[in-house]
Design a protein with these regions (language model features):
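Serine-hydrolase catalytic-loop signature spanning alpha/beta hydrolases and amidase-signature enzymes
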Residues: 76, 81-84, 89, 105, ...
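A glycine/proline-hinged amphipathic helix-loop "lid/cap" segment
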Residues: 1-58, 62
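Short beta-to-alpha linker loops that shape the active-site pocket of alpha/beta-hydrolase fold enzymes
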Residues: 109-113
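Gly/Ser-rich "nucleophile elbow"/oxyanion-hole loop immediately N-terminal to the catalytic nucleophile
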Residues: 133-149
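Alpha/beta-hydrolase active-site loop
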Residues: 116-138
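Short amphipathic alpha-helix adjacent to the substrate-entry channel of hydrolases
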Residues: 87-108, 123
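Short beta-strand element of the alpha/beta-hydrolase
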Residues: 60, 70-80
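Structural signature of beta-strand start/N-cap positions in the alpha/beta core
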Residues: 73, 102-104, 144-145
Length: 151
């Protein structure tokens, strides 16, 4: 982590909190590769759409280390203060979580502030969890082993 922070400091860019949400998102996307971790090859990587309570179709990506049925499933909420971040910025991290933990990971593109005010992101997370619980077997996950996490 020290090397990541040092590279960020050397880049000399304005801190994210001093930028507009749009500019911060662009900068965050551009810096997504700062971890320099190779992209893990997984048995399954699938893009999904999960319905929110208001009919909005949330983009999501499922990562699975194997094609075995009955794997535990983690609903992953990317970091970024509910203002920045996306499936793309956390793709490598979610691949590593799936590979190292031996579980499915579903990364959710929840709606971001300030365009979508509270409680949009938490409602999106709850709606996604409910949908995953009711569709776990279709996804080949174990419905008794669901978790929520993120950074």
């Amino acid at each position: 982590m020290r090397s990541v922070l040092e590279r960020m400091a050397r880049a000399g860019h304005a801190p994210l909190h001093t930028r507009s949400p749009q500019d911060a998102r662009v900068a965050y996307e551009a810096g997504a590769g700062v971890l320099e971790v190779p992209k893990a090859t997984l048995a399954r990587v699938e893009d999904l759409h999960i319905p929110a309570r208001d009919g909005h179709a949330m983009a999501a990506r499922l990562y699975a280390p194997s094609t075995d049925a009955g794997l535990p499933l983690l609903l992953y909420m990317h970091g970024g203060g509910f203002t920045i971040g996306s499936i793309a910025t956390h793709d490598i991290l979610c691949r590593e979580l799936a590979r190292l933990a031996g579980c499915m990971v579903v990364s959710l593109d929840y709606r971001l502030a300030p365009e979508h005010r509270f409680p949009a992101a938490s409602n999106d997370a709850w709606d996604a969890l409910q949908w995953l619980a009711s569709h776990a077997e279709t996804l080949r996950a174990d419905p008794a082993r669901l978790a929520v996490g993120g950074d």
